[in-house]
């Protein structure tokens, strides 16, 4: 447990310091990160290329590689945006993100005056930012996000802290049906 806490606090401190950098500079870091991640480390490159080839059988290799590079660019942005969550203000987050149609959904739910379950899919854009949904809706409505616990306990603790900071509740995937 001491080792988990040591890793947790060390990584938290480092990531928090990085999160204090302006987002514009973090995006610059993201652009730099792309090259070693794609060309040197080749993080999961075979899996990604195989998945893209299976998803787009009509595309030739040149087009697949282009999509692959776009994914890596997106992935690097995801990394720095996730870091930024350690220090981003509510105002700054709300300026950078919107939920379209949310007012109508909340209004309909309030009219019916019944219990409801609002499901949203998080694997689009930066799904860590989507955990901020409670900022946009009434405080009377509780929010939760389903998550898969990470294998590394220190990182699991770190990401739970990150995801819970907006007022939502993280629901482990295995307990979803019982919890909802």
Where are the regions that the model predicts?
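Catalytic core of membrane glycerolipid acyltransferases/transacylases, capturing the structured
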Residues: 115-175
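Short, intrinsically disordered, charge-balanced linker/junction segments flanking boundaries
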Residues: 176-180
